[in-house]
């Protein structure tokens, strides 16, 4: 039963611990986090059950970039687009049904939320919102889905949290709920007009939870891949003596439709329930009945059976090709000069592939793009000239496709453009920086010229040339004018 939530305002304490990933930030469960975000679980499997969200689109390559307008709930992403932060490229995150996403177990009370930051912006606050107990899990997320009073709000006084490979954790008091709920975590940064939106799919004990004590989860069927006709997928059952092959359930893929990831997982769970007495697969209700799902299916073991765990094995008819791209030569910083900034890169391919490289600035404006075809083992050099060079954070996005045009992998690397440090002019050995005070120059006057050198005005009668300068008549300009040597002597 839903109870009124308590809002927690906490002074932060940092726990910097080792992590692993690659440009902004997301809710993670790498170390001590209670649950990873929907976006994070599109890229990284859970640590215990190895579950992973599927069919996520582009966010599987960059869960750290779910960034939208700040100001939630008064402003921010529109209703129906909250999970994807209003970004078209992350629209898959906005899909919402009771069984669409992996759910992480949680209980009310003190819980640790963990963030991984790949660009550590200065921070105003973190805020956490929870869906109402009576929300509709089969309707897109709107403001009406949530209790708009954050149950946890944390100030950070415009400081920067620790950067990857460290994680950052803080504690919140989670209100009581039952069953499937969604937490919305909002990271409000202080150096842009944006915020990062991470929804977290969680499941509380209570209605919809496992209430039959005779069953405990011993494994998970995850829709990790599509299978081909003739491929085999099977359970590997372990008891106190090791693997028990006699309890294995095997499914042979008979057609292309059955080979789709969400379909074969449902079919395998159904077959397990028909063949096994001490193993069940799917959602377990309070009557002890299993309902196979089109997608992830928990695998349960009966108490007293002596069974310990279940793993999933594959026997594939075809060997999948290996693809890998190494990009060398990308610097962490480039100094802005008079000419266009250039990235001089070297590409090394494993597998035949088409590579698309795009450079974006922090505002996600494309500044350069190139396409390269590489054969297995081939290396090529690429020079990318940026259309404009402004200081700040930039990103190089690489997309690898096979020769059929199917996306294999997308990666993103960060770099920064910085302004060239201005060397202060030497002090104490000149009177003016030319052409300051030009009409007052006389014999012996020393000036710092445009070329960085110091010049001294000649003695009479040549000193009269030193004052003969305008923006359109520059022939006596020291060091650079066509007749400068008639008026000036170079000092250094």
Curated annotation (Swiss-Prot):
Entry-linked Pfam families: GbpA_2, GbpA_D3, LPMO_10
Domain Chitin-binding type-3, residue spans: 443-484
Signal peptide location: 1-23
Entries under Gene3D superfamilies matching the protein: 2.60.40.2550, 3.30.70.2150, chitin-binding protein cbp21
Gene Ontology cellular component list: extracellular region
Any GO MF annotation of the entry: chitin binding
Record keyword Transcription present: no
Primary localization class, coarse: secreted
Residues in Chitin-binding type-4 domain copies: 24-204
Keywords: Chitin-binding, Secreted, Signal
Key word Signal present: yes
Record's subcellular location: Secreted
PANTHER family the record matches: CHITIN-BINDING TYPE-4 DOMAIN-CONTAINING PROTEIN, GLCNAC-BINDING PROTEIN A
Chain's role: Probably interacts with GlcNAc residues. May promote attachment to both epithelial cell surfaces and chitin.
Family, per entry: Belongs to the GbpA family.
Xref: HAMAP family: GbpA (MF_01905)
Protein name: GlcNAc-binding protein A
Organism of derivation: Aliivibrio fischeri (strain ATCC 700601 / ES114)
Gene name tied to this protein: gbpA
């Amino acid at each position: 039963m839903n109870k009124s939530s308590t809002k927690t305002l906490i002074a932060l304490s940092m726990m910097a611990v080792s992590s692993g990933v690659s440009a902004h930030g997301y809710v993670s469960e790498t170390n001590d986090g209670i649950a990873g975000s929907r976006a994070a679980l599109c890229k990284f499997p859970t640590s215990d059950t190895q579950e992973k969200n599927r069919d996520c689109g582009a966010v599987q390559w960059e869960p750290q970039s779910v960034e939208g307008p700040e100001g939630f709930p008064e402003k921010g992403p529109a209703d129906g687009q909250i999970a994807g932060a209003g970004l078209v490229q992350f629209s898959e995150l906005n899909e919402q049904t009771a069984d669409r996403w992996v759910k992480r177990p949680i209980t009310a009370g003190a819980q640790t939320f963990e963030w991984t930051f790949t660009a550590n912006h200065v921070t105003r606050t973190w805020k956490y919102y929870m869906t109402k107990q009576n929300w509709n899990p089969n309707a897109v997320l709107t403001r009406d889905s949530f209790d708009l009073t954050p149950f946890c709000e944390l100030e950070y006084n415009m400081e920067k949290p620790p950067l990857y490979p460290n994680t950052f954790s803080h504690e919140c008091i989670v209100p009581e709920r039952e069953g499937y709920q969604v937490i919305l975590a909002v990271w409000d940064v202080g150096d842009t007009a944006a915020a990062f939106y991470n929804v977290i799919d969680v499941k509380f004990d209570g209605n919809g939870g496992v209430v039959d004590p005779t069953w405990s989860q011993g494994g998970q069927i995850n829709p990790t891949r599509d299978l081909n006709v003739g491929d085999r997928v099977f359970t590997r059952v372990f008891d106190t003596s090791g693997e028990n092959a006699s309890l294995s359930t095997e499914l042979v893929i008979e057609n292309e439709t059955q080979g789709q990831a969400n379909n074969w997982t449902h079919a395998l769970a159904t077959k397990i329930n028909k063949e096994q007495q001490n193993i069940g697969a799917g959602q377990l209700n309070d009557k002890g009945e299993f309902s196979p799902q089109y997608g992830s299916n928990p695998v349960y073991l009966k108490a007293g059976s002596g069974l310990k765990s279940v793993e999933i094995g594959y026997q594939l008819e075809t060997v999948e090709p290996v693809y890998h791209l190494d990009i060398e030569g990308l610097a962490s910083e480039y100094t802005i000069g008079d000419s266009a900034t250039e990235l001089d890169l070297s590409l090394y391919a494993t597998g035949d592939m088409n590579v698309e490289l795009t450079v974006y600035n922090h505002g996600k404006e494309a500044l350069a793009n190139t396409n390269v075809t590489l054969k297995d083992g081939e290396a090529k050099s690429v020079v990318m000239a940026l259309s404009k060079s402004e200081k700040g954070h930039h990103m190089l996005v690489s997309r690898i496709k096979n020769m059929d045009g199917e996306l294999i992998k997308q990666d993103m690397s960060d770099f920064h453009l910085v302004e060239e440090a201005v060397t202060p002019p030497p002090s104490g050995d000149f009177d003016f920086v030319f052409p300051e005070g030009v009409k007052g120059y006389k014999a012996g006057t020393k000036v710092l010229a445009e070329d960085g050198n110091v010049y001294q005005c000649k003695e009479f009668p040549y000193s009269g040339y030193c004052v003969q300068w305008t923006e359109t008549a520059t022939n006596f300009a020291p060091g650079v004018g066509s007749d400068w040597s008639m008026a000036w002597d170079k000092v250094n």
